[in-house]
Amino acid sequence: MPEEAETFAFQAEIAQLMSLIINTFYSNKEIFLRELISNASDALDKIRYESLTDPSKLDSGKELYIKLIPNKTAGTLTIIDTGIGMTKSDLVNNLGTIAKSGTKAFMEALQAGADISMIGQFGVGFYSAYLVADKVTVTSKNNDDEQYVWESSAGGSFTVRADNSEPLGRGTKIVLFIKEDQTDYLEESKIKEIVNKHSQFIGYPIKLLVEKEREKEVSDDEDDEKKEGDEKKEMDTDEPKIEDVGEDEDADKKDKDAKKKKTIKEKYTEDEELNKTKPIWTRNPDDISQEEYGEFYKSLTNDWEDHLAVKHFSVEGQLEFRALLFIPRRTPFDLFENQKKRNNIKLYVRRVFIMDNCEDLIPEYLNFIKGVVD
């Protein structure tokens, strides 16, 4: 018997923000996945940090990962993490009744023409789920509480109830019920493209449940049964039959040979890790070999040649950042095209991709330099 659900009203500013997200047309809706993966990564950071002083915190699940499960039949996209999880009060407060300080600021920025992709910087990235979903459920289990489910179709209210279904162990499972006109976000290729663009350097494995096909050899038993049935029918008829024993033996032999091998195609699912390239800019330059720099450069730029030079440094103080910059071996063919949009340096914040057209990062005369700033 399902537990009774409590209904809560969204805090006024949050309800306003959700209405704005749902009723305004935004072209880059794909950022919803970046935000949810980023939140999952934060939750994993928290449990890992707690486990440093108390290893027993990981008794509820040692493996730290993020998993994506598209289901075209049900029209859902599920995002699971084995992070710290949320208590009942976390679900009520964080997802609806207490407005983050950035809620109002973000709405004002949106109305002034800011890009929806800035949503995460204001601490309200979760609500970007409603760019592509008309209903969202969040199942969560924290070590200090029972398992609860938060649910909302964004109509000004949400429900929270105890959950006795499949136990998570620890962590959070978000199920997005995808809008009918957004089902391309259930395609494996689309999910891979978004993760590769925005979340390639998240510090935990991001696994995608993919459907694959393999060839399988089976014995042709069904054909046997069918043949036996046909023979029985023939025996039941009264007409006499002349048999050639030699021919029969040959036919039997051929039948057996054919029966031995029949190849069928079988579908199966398995987890595929999407973010195997690790963010080497977070490591100490002394520990990184030239081969590793070379591999990273090629994966970043799709250049087939090695780089000419590399500079890897960090700045600490009021403003903190790490930079890994490469000079390519060859001059770009469009070096002197002034109108071309520059996107050679990717800007990340805490390993999450933000933009690749930040013109203030480097002067125009150095626009051939490639790399990352985090």
From Swiss-Prot:
Location(s), subcellular: Cytoplasm
Keywords: ATP-binding, Chaperone, Cytoplasm, Nucleotide-binding, Stress response
Name of the protein in question: Heat shock protein 83
GO terms for MF: ATP binding; ATP hydrolysis activity; ATP-dependent protein folding chaperone; insulin receptor binding; TPR domain binding; unfolded protein binding
One record GO biological process: cold acclimation
Originating gene: Hsp83
Protein family membership: Belongs to the heat shock protein 90 family.
Membrane-crossing segments per the record: none
Domain of life: Eukaryota
Biased composition (Basic and acidic residues): 226-244
List of residues binding ATP: N39, D81, K100, F126
Coiled coil stretches, renumbered: none
Species name: Drosophila virilis
Pfam families: HATPase_c_3 (PF13589), HSP90 (PF00183)
